[in-house]
Amino acid sequence: MADEATNPNTNGPGSGILRQILNLEDAILIEPQLHAVTPAQHAARDAADAVRRLIRGLESTSAPIDQLANLTAELDRLTRTLTEDLPATTSSEKSTVTYQAHRLRERSPFIGQANPVALPLVMEFVEGGIDAVANFSSLYEGPPGCLHGGYIAGIFDEVLGAAQTFSGHAGMTGRLTIHYRSPTPLNTDLHLRARLESVSGRKIMCKGTLHAGDRLCAEAEGLFISVDPKKLLGFISS
């Protein structure tokens, strides 16, 4: 079957197809106003913010050994308090769209607001794809003053994976190709653009760019393979 470019106007965030197949994206990005943040979620996000501040402090600290030892003991105590007698999530709970939407929105390693190690990435659905902004500190340094290439690959996988939902199908990454064009600076607003390119059977192709100001830092192509959402949720719960 020949590749056919998908019309974003028929498969955009407002389409019934996308809403039926990808309720996760509805919950996370498309209609956040329909998903009020609960007091428990606010508390978890505040705690995650506090841990992020701690991580940033540890990354740059020159505190003496005894102070670090006391900090370690206190963190161990807090960890025990936090993890004692926590109920396990059942397989049936994991297999629901509601659970997975909450997991991605709150705990995703890329956009999870309650995940203290989530990357500083903010995505927005636009016509035909995704626009995103990220700003990385020295925590993510690879070459001196520059973002590590592994994080560049990771954020491309995230934004291209979101853009492929405009095909009207749920796809998983089959191949990700990164072209590193120039060093990507730290402590700078980075602008990512991801667009759906074509659909051929189960194959969904997307392309993206990463800029720091006017400078092109990287480009990417992603091949995604569409998967039945029910089968995917079944796999997650197994």
Show the residue positions of the predicted features.
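HotDog/MaoC-like acyl-thioester-processing domains
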Residues: 2-93, 184-186, 197-238
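Long amphipathic N-terminal alpha/beta scaffold segment
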Residues: 65-141
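Active-site helix/loop of acyl-thioester processing domains in fatty-acid/polyketide metabolism
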Residues: 127-129, 147-170
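Alpha-helix N-cap/helix-initiation motif
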Residues: 144-145, 149, 183
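Short, structured beta-strand/loop micro-motifs enriched in basic residues and often containing a Trp
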Residues: 171-175
